[in-house]
Curated annotation (Swiss-Prot):
Gene3D superfamilies hit by this protein: 3.40.50.2020
InterPro entries, per database record: PRib_PP_synth_CS, Pribosyltran_N, PRibTrfase_dom, PRTase-like, Rib-P_diPkinase, Rib-P_diPkinase_bac
The protein's name: Ribose-phosphate pyrophosphokinase
Active site: 201
UniProt: ATP binding residues: 43-45, 102-103
UniProt family annotation: Belongs to the ribose-phosphate pyrophosphokinase family. Class I subfamily.
Pathway it works in: Metabolic intermediate biosynthesis; 5-phospho-alpha-D-ribose 1-diphosphate biosynthesis; 5-phospho-alpha-D-ribose 1-diphosphate from D-ribose 5-phosphate (route I): step 1/1
Catalytic reactions on record: D-ribose 5-phosphate + ATP = 5-phospho-alpha-D-ribose 1-diphosphate + AMP + H(+)
Lineage: Bacteria, Bacillati, Bacillota, Clostridia, Eubacteriales
EC number: 2.7.6.1
UniProt gene name: prs
GO MF annotations, alphabetized: ATP binding; kinase activity; magnesium ion binding; ribose phosphate diphosphokinase activity
TM stretches of this protein: none
Length: 320
C-alpha cells in the first residue's frame, strides 16, 4: 500500500481590525488573502462566513484586538471557532496587538487578571498557536498552554533611527519612560550605540502619570523615548516635557503600538516631541493625521514568521 503525504496548504485570513496589514503580509508571503466575511446581524451579533474550503489547511488569522477591543476580540474568537469546525489542520492566531495585556497581574485586592483570561478563551476557541508582537508584559507568554511566538518591534525601530543619523552619536541618549521599560530601552540603545536614561514616574490613577526624577545625563542631549505602547500619550508627553525642562536639546519618541485613545493626538501635537515613530500593529488610518507621526510596517517580519512557522523552521532568529 502506497502512503501519500501531501503537505497542507497555507492560507491567510483577516478580521476587520487591520485588513491593510493583513493584505500586506499576504502579498509578501506570496498568497492571496483568503475569502472570509466578518459581518454583523441587525442586533450587533458577529457572523463569520468562510467562502472557500479550509479542510486540512495551515490557517493564519490576522486580527489585532485593538479598539473597539471587545468587538475585535469576539471577531477573532468566532473566526477561530469557524475554522476549527471547518476542519482546518492548524490555526494560528496572528495578533499584532494583544489587547487586555495591561491587566496582567493583581495590583490591588479582587482585581481580575484579564490577560490570562483572554489567553484561556483563545485556546478554548480552538487556536493551536499564537503569533504576536511586544506584549505589554513578557510574562503573558506563560499564560498560554499552546505555543506562542513573541516578535519584537525594537529591531524595526532601531533600524529606522540608525539609518536616519542617530547611530553612534555622542549627543544621543535613549530614555526609558518608566522602570518597567528599561530592558526594552537598553536593547534599543544597543542598536544605535547610545547610553540610556530612566524616568522615575508614579501613577496616581490609571492613564495618569507624574514624573518624579530623571536618572542619567540628558542635558544638551537629543533624547529618544521608547515604550511598548502609547495610549492617552500622558506618559510620553509628560516625560518629554520633563526632559526639556531639565535641559534636553530635542526629544523624539517611538513605540510599537499606537493605541492613541482619548486626548492622545492633541497631546502629541501640542507637545515638545519632534517626531513619533510607531509601527502599524494597530490601524490608525482613521485617526486625524499628524505631521509628527511616522508609521513603519511590521508586515515583513510577520510574513517571515508565518513562512517559518509554516515550513516548520526556527523562528528564534527573528527575536534578535
Amino acid at each position: 500500500m502506497v502512503m501519500i503525504h501531501e503537505r497542507k496548504s497555507l492560507k491567510i485570513f483577516a478580521g476587520n481590525s487591520n485588513d491593510k496589514l493583513a493584505k500586506d503580509i499576504a502579498d509578501i508571503v506570496g498568497v492571496p488573502l483568503g475569502s472570509a466575511e466578518v459581518g454583523r446581524f441587525s442586533d450587533g451579533e458577529i457572523t463569520v462566513n468562510i467562502n472557500e474550503t479550509v479542510r486540512g489547511i495551515d490557517a493564519f488569522i490576522i486580527q489585532s484586538t485593538s479598539a473597539p477591543v471587545n468587538d475585535n476580540l469576539m471577531e477573532l474568537l468566532i473566526m477561530i471557532d469557524a475554522f476549527k469546525r471547518a476542519s482546518a489542520g492548524r490555526i494560528t492566531a496572528v495578533i499584532p496587538y494583544y489587547g487586555y495585556a495591561r491587566q496582567d497581574r493583581k495590583t490591588k485586592a479582587r482585581d481580575p487578571i484579564t490577560a490570562k483570561l483572554v489567553a484561556d478563551i483563545l485556546t478554548a476557541a480552538g487556536a493551536d498557536r499564537v503569533l504576536t508582537m511586544d506584549l505589554h508584559a513578557s510574562q503573558i507568554q506563560g499564560y498560554f498552554d499552546i505555543p506562542l511566538d513573541h516578535l519584537l518591534g525594537v529591531p524595526i525601530l532601531g533600524k529606522y533611527f540608525a539609518e536616519n543619523g542617530f547611530d553612534q552619536r555622542e549627543d544621543v541618549v535613549v530614555v526609558s519612560p518608566d522602570l518597567g521599560s528599561v530592558t526594552r530601552a537598553r536593547k534599543f540603545a544597543d542598536r544605535i550605540h547610545a547610553p540610556i536614561a530612566i524616568i522615575d514616574k508614579r501613577r496616581p490613577k490609571p492613564n495618569v502619570s507624574e514624573v518624579m526624577h530623571i536618572i542619567g545625563d540628558i542635558k544638551d542631549k537629543t533624547c529618544i523615548l521608547i515604550d511598548d505602547m502609547i495610549d492617552t500619550a500622558g506618559t510620553i508627553t509628560n516625560g518629554a516635557n520633563a526632559l526639556v525642562e531639565r535641559g534636553a536639546k530635542d526629544v523624539y519618541a517611538c513605540c510599537t503600538h499606537a493605541v492613541l485613545s482619548g486626548p492622545a493626538m492633541e497631546r502629541i501635537d501640542n507637545s515638545v516631541i519632534k517626531e513619533l515613530i510607531t509601527l502599524n500593529t494597530i490601524d490608525i488610518s482613521k485617526i486625524k493625521p499628524s505631521d509628527k507621526i511616522k508609521v513603519l510596517s511590521v508586515a515583513p517580519v510577520f510574513a517571515e514568521a508565518i513562512r517559518r512557522i509554516y515550513e516548520e523552521i526556527s523562528v528564534s532568529k527573528l527575536f534578535d
